[in-house]
């Protein structure tokens, strides 16, 4: 009866996280060799919640939880589930089948085993000497070990099973889990629909798996994987994504620090600001702005530890990027521009709260894509390459000529062992990262600008979530053209550089007998007017859309309850216990006082409302006002010059007439 009551009271909590717990059905499992135990996995899906009393367990063969790879464990679990289903036992029908993903299960399982043994001993003690709920709860929380994210969730479940978790705390925890799942569901729904729609007409029963995989690989853009590796329940995928969310909050990154000199480290204190000056960094670092921005951000985001990036390989790769960016001695598309776009992308991720909704691989894709997005830029436009029938245009068939070269060359660089910064990524991680980076870099092709804006506006008008990859593409593209949205002293220097690059192309076009490309004739361009038009029709609409998509992606996270409500405070409020023996609460990322240097913070105002910073709007208006003043002066000067020329011409005519009369 006690077990039935416990199962009923925590069913919804288990369904939110698809929690796993060791079976306690036999005495041999309680006292036998732990290496020989069978793990019983209780699967509770939304459909099963109404039939919890009749739900069954899937028996998984003994697994070496200490030495066996987690992915192999997952495959073994899935195979065991299929065998169980085919034999007629376990879950009824296809709709009730769910795969068990055991990734990261090693420590939670061993923890629960220890906790179960401790729970049994505690239960025996309680039979002899009953204690009050408050005192037992205090003792339990004070003696809780310092656990990682998943283990903390397991510990909450253990407290619930043992009846030591207050009902109010349980309610808050369930509300929190539901909100997180709701946030994950928006993106997950779109992703799963994209995966399933392409081959929806070809059911698994009508063709063999091999033929279906060939169809997917040949006639769709989806990355076809083996069928058995694909989750069957959206709830399972949501639970996994929720686990990743908690893991991000709890993870204590042990970052391998890249070497950054003190004077450069001092400048890097401003790397989280929109007004950061890559020009100053380039001067102090003696031309190595890109390398040190790369070092700093790989440190801040923990990529060195998360993806096991070799320090030597990173230094070699960034140095090679700098060589490529300096190849054509461009006044604009150079090392400083690459550092600027990367730092601006970092601001978009870290200071708006967007990083909280992204995985580590997505964060790496954004920053890596920004680092390489103009590698070996020739200083000419795609249209110039097409019109001149350059080697690049021939190679890439006039399609995003430069962008294809940038991304292709940068991945080719990593074929050299001493520059392979992705050597420790799994095959699937590398494939996913490569696909995202290619999409991000190709989206910097200016010919795709209006299509990107139109697509994003359509997504913003719909109630569903935004396609995450398209959002990341637009963010990097916006940062690529964001110099008119920077402080005037930076914007003016960028304008001088880009126009000089245009003028050089115009000079080359004239020497080749080609017509001038727009803004490339140094004798006719009106600088102020060109920048006003660029701001009005390109940059400002892009930044407005960016602000709207950031709000839509981050706003769901604001509705999460205070993270310290996950764990009840000590009964007596004492602090005599060692911190290492107490459960620490989730970091409150919504706190407006959170350090701006944090890459995972949600900007809120004093009223607790989402307040995403948009400093670019202020600078856009200021810079446009500067250009309007300059345009007025240029127009006045032009009129004076034209009047002087007209007066000189009239005077010449008069002189000619006088000379003619005198001659006659």
From Swiss-Prot:
Classification via CDD domains = HDc
Reactions the enzyme catalyzes: a nucleoside 3',5'-cyclic phosphate + H2O = a nucleoside 5'-phosphate + H(+)
Q: What is its EC number?
A: 3.1.4.17
Q: What InterPro entries has UniProt attached to this entry?
A: HD/PDEase_dom, PDEase, PDEase_catalytic_dom, PDEase_catalytic_dom_sf, PDEase_CS, PDEase_N
Q: How is the cofactor bound?
A: Binds 2 divalent metal cations per subunit. Site 1 may preferentially bind zinc ions, while site 2 has a preference for magnesium and/or manganese ions.
Disulphide bridges in this chain?
Answer: none
Domain (PDEase) ranges: 256-634
**Residue sites binding a divalent metal cation 2 per the record:** 374
Q: What function is annotated for this protein?
A: Redundantly with pde-5, plays a role in the AFD thermosensory neurons to regulate microvilli receptive ending morphology, possibly by regulating cGMP levels.
- Record's protein name: Probable 3',5'-cyclic phosphodiesterase pde-1
Gene name of the record: pde-1
């Amino acid at each position: 009866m006690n077990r039935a009551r416990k199962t009923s009271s925590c069913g919804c909590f288990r369904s939110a996280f698809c929690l796993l717990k060791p079976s306690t059905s036999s005495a041999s499992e309680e006292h036998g060799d732990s290496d020989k135990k069978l793990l019983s996995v209780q699967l509770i899906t939304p459909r099963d919640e109404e039939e919890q009393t009749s739900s069954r367990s899937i028996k998984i063969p003994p697994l070496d939880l200490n030495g066996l790879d987690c992915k192999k464990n997952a495959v073994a679990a899935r195979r065991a589930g299929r065998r169980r289903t085919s034999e007629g036992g376990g879950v009824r029908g296809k709709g009730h089948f769910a795969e068990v993903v055991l990734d990261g299960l090693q420590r939670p399982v061993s923890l629960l085993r220890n906790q179960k043994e401790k729970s049994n001993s505690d239960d025996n003690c309680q039979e002899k000497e009953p204690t009050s709920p408050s005192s037992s709860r205090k003792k339990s929380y004070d003696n809780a070990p310092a656990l990682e994210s998943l283990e903390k969730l397991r510990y909450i479940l253990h407290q619930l099973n043992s009846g030591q978790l207050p009902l109010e705390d349980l309610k808050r925890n369930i509300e929190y889990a539901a909100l997180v799942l709701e946030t994950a569901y928006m993106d997950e729904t779109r992703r799963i629909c994209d995966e399933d729609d392409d081959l929806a007409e070809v059911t698994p029963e009508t063709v063999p798996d091999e033929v279906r995989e060939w169809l997917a690989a040949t006639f769709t853009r989806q990355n076809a994987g083996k069928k058995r590796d694909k989750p069957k329940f959206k709830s399972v995928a949501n639970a996994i994504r929720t686990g990743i969310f908690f893991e991000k909050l709890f993870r204590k990154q042990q970052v391998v620090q890249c070497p950054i000199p003190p004077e450069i480290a001092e400048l890097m204190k401003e790397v989280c600001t929109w007004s950061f000056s890559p020009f100053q960094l380039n001067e102090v670092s003696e031309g190595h702005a890109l390398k040190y921005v790369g070092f700093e951000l790989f440190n801040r985001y923990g990529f060195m530890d998360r993806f096991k990036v070799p320090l030597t390989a990173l230094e070699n790769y960034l140095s090679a990027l700098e060589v490529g960016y300096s190849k054509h001695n461009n006044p604009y598309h150079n090392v400083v521009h690459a550092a600027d776009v990367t730092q601006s992308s970092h601001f978009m991720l870290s200071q708006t709260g967007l990083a909280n909704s992204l995985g580590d691989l997505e964060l790496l894709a954004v920053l890596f894509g920004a680092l390489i997005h103009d590698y070996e830029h020739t200083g000419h436009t795609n249209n110039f390459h097409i019109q001149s029938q350059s080697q690049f245009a021939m190679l890439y068939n006039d399609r995003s000529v430069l962008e294809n070269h940038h991304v292709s060359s940068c991945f080719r660089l990593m074929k050299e062992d001493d520059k392979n910064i992705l050597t420790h990524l799994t095959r699937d991680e590398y494939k996913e990262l490569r696909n995202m980076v290619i999409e991000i870099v190709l989206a910097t092709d200016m010919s795709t600008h209006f299509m990107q804006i139109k697509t994003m506006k359509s997504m913003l008008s719909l109630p569903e979530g935004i396609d995450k990859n398209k959002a990341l593409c637009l963010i990097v593209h916006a940062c690529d053209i964001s110099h008119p949205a920077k402080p005037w002293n930076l914007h003016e220097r960028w304008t001088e550089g880009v126009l000089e690059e245009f003028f050089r192309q115009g000079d080359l076009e004239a020497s080749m007998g080609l017509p001038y490309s727009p803004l490339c004739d140094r004798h006719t361009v009106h600088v102020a007017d060109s920048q006003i038009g660029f701001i009005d029709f390109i940059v400002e609409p892009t930044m407005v859309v960016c602000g709207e998509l950031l709000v839509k992606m981050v706003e769901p996270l604001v509705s999460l309850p205070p993270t310290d409500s996950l764990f009840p405070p000590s009964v007596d409020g004492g602090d005599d216990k060692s911190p290492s023996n107490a459960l620490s609460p989730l970091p409150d990322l919504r706190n407006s006082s959170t350090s701006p240097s944090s890459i995972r913070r949600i900007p809120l105002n004093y009223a607790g409302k989402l307040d995403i910073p948009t400093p670019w709007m202020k600078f856009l208006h200021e810079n446009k006002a500067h250009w309007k003043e300059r345009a007025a002066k240029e127009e006045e000067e032009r009129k004076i010059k034209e009047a002087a020329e007209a007066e000189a011409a009239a005077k010449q005519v008069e002189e000619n007439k006088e000379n003619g009369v005198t001659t006659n």
